[in-house]
Swiss-Prot record:
Residues 355-379 have a biased composition (Polar residues). Belongs to the ATP25 family. The gene is ATP25. Its main location: mitochondrion. The keyword Cell inner membrane does not apply. The lineage of its organism: Eukaryota, Fungi, Dikarya, Ascomycota, Pezizomycotina. This is ATPase synthesis protein 25, mitochondrial. One of its GO terms (biological process) is mitochondrial gene expression.
Amino acid sequence: MSRVLLRGIQCHACRSNVIRSFISVSDVAITPLAGGSRSTAQARPPPLSRNFSSQHAKLFSNQPSDNAELVVDPIPEIHTGEETEGQPEESQEHIPWYLKEEQVEETIPHPLRKQQPLPPLPENPPPILENLLEHISVDIGLDNLSLLDLRRLDPPPALGANLIMIFGTARGVKHLNVSADRLCRWLRTTYKLRPDADGLLGRNELKIKLRRKARRAKLAKSAKSTLTQPDDGITTGWICVDVGTVEGGQFRKPEEELRKVGFVGFGTVVEGTRIVVQMMTEEKRQEIDLEGLWRQKLERNSLENEGLPQPQAAAPQEAGDIHEQLTVPPTNISHQISHATQISANYEQRRGISTGSRRYQDATSDTWGTSQISPNSETTHLEPSAPSSLTSLSHHFKNIPPHEAIYDLGQGTHDRCSTAFLQQFYQEVARAPSELASSRRIELMCIAIELHHPGYRKPDLFQAIQEHVLSNYALTRAQFLQILDAFLSFKPDLTSNPPRLLLPNADMELALQIIDHAGLRGLNLLDSTILVKLFVGVSFRAQVYPVKEKDLPNSPVIGNRIPVPLNTCDAVKRVQSRLTRVKTAAKITFTTEQYMRILRVLFDQGSYSEFWNTWEDMALAGIARDKALYVFLFQLHAESDGWQCFTTQLLNCIPMMERENPPVHLDGELAEVTQKCITIAYPEIIDRVERNEQNPLVRMWHRCRVAIENAAAAGGRGQDSTAPYVCNHSDI
């Protein structure tokens, strides 16, 4: 110890206490002073010396030393009362920093946590989840974090059972790639996991793509052009990081469901929880709305998996208010409840409850044409006539003119009582089972839209279909095709400027959404019927011919053909070409009627090359080109002009008719339309016939005239007017 320090302390007792306080650290005891020296310590030492000794012993001596009994400190015993009196003075004394007790400072939360709160943890979370959210929010810096617990989803998602999905927004494309890369590295080093990042480019791969993009941009700049490729494979804006299966947090199903009778499966039950992190840019997250789609799936699944209520006196209100509630006598209610089957809350038994509801309604109806049901009667003997009644009402429009059908349909979707038909229809709908009522209501709206009723709109039909689907009702193929026809139906407006000849984009979008939903339900979309409907739906609804945009105002109507912009016509042809390639790739075969619809569309828009290619494809596909098909061919050309450059192809079909299998002979009906086509292609044919020129065209005219005369003579004698005219091929 420094001598200067000891010299500064004049009191011997204080110097002894100072030395004792330092040496007590090494557990060395000091013998107390003799009695003679005790007298010198009668005076009270300075408070600093005592405080120094006591505080030092508290701070440094963790355990009592072995010689603690030999150490005697007489000063605290003598001056105990004085110390208690002098405590207020000690509190005012200056305390050095090394004598102050350390105070535990409150932990200050991270500033990013205030700006971006972490989503609450779900029930029974896996241990890694909290650290993962903390790392994603603070270290990586993703914003707007949200968490979806998909562990209760039944059936489980395609990513796997016991799934927890985390959504986060990156500040940009570069931040997105860096965040995904750092997250994968953190998971590998910290938890020894093997994450899979779908959409993440490796560092070398990203450098290569950026280098190639810069090279292409440089070449395009030197060529004075711009890069028009919309997707360069770099700026996807979406990376899905599959963390993998982690320990803990799995959802345990009740034992009753695990011991379900009749359940058959394979494989083993996967233990643990799978975590998936969806990283997206702000624009991509708003565009796809993946979080909203999963939330809808969760809400629908929670409704399906809830405990179903017991049968009650009043029928539950279905989605869309399709039918009204009925009041039933208590005897019938007790009878139905007593005969209801015991069911559990799953998908199949839910339809069982719906069946019970149908029987309950059928038994209480008085207008089905059945006798009054007694309380002791069996519900299995009921034969309701509601389906037949609704079916007859739906077929009512097939036997009346369109204007009468539009009148019977009333003012619109919400009109239910303005006409006698609507009153009867909705009375039957109120008594019918809910699923049948929903189907017939959709069918009625489809019929009205196909008739171009102004009060029935396609968005209302789409809403009715959504209610039908959310009610877990079936959607048959016939219903789907009828709905598709309604959305693709369109009445051209020739009076507008410019004329509206194409289906609006909004209607096509609704049709495509219905097609997507049908595909999710398992319906075959690579079908000739659907392909032809789409082919006709995207086409012009009148005969047109293309002109340049600048020449459109001065272009007249030629015959029946209306001028349309060249770029619009090219866009329609591109879509038709894609559908044709789909047909070829999927090896889809068309029927004769479907080929006729495609031929008419191609002829109306002036695609004559594609028209004759399709005509030849029919023969290659093995389609029998019979008389009806040839009449259709010549009738198309007889109704319009503009095809004169393809006259040779048309006239070559006449000798080809008798080479078909079976052969098609030239009769009166065929001869009439053939003469019309010859007249359009060669207006001077009458002069040539009068001059009796010797050429194939005149001989063909005479052959058609003879066939018409034979048909007229056969009709006058009461014989078949379609008797063929057979001639020698040398006459042609």
